[in-house]
């Protein structure tokens, strides 16, 4: 559902689609799950390499699809740390991609 909302955002340029009742729960669940995994990775409870071996691509795709709404929420809440663990995890996924698959693009 996150990707469907993102596709509609790209078509219309209207970022309120992420807060539409039809998508909001799924968007929130997805970004919260990645933020929680990011916290587990950051604290060494989940291996970074093990996680990224399996999930690097979906992590990057999800970050790219949700970055606009995360940034909007950071601004509206005046809280730059909102979903920071997800952002760091996505940054790690990008580094992983560049190292393991230099010619790949998400």
Which residues fall in each region the model found?
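Amphipathic alpha-helical "stem/stalk" segments
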Residues: 1-106
């Amino acid at each position: 559902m996150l990707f469907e909302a993102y596709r509609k955002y790209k078509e219309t340029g209207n970022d309120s689609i992420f807060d539409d009742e039809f998508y909001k729960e799924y968007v929130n669940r997805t970004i919260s799950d990645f933020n929680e995994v990011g916290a587990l990775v950051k604290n060494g409870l989940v291996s970074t390499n093990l996680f990224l071996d399996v999930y690097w691509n979906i992590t990057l795709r999800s970050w790219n699809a949700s970055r606009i709404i995360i940034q909007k929420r950071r601004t509206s809440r005046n809280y730059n740390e909102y979903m920071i663990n997800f952002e760091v995890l996505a940054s790690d996924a990008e580094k992983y991609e560049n190292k393991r698959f230099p010619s790949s693009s998400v």
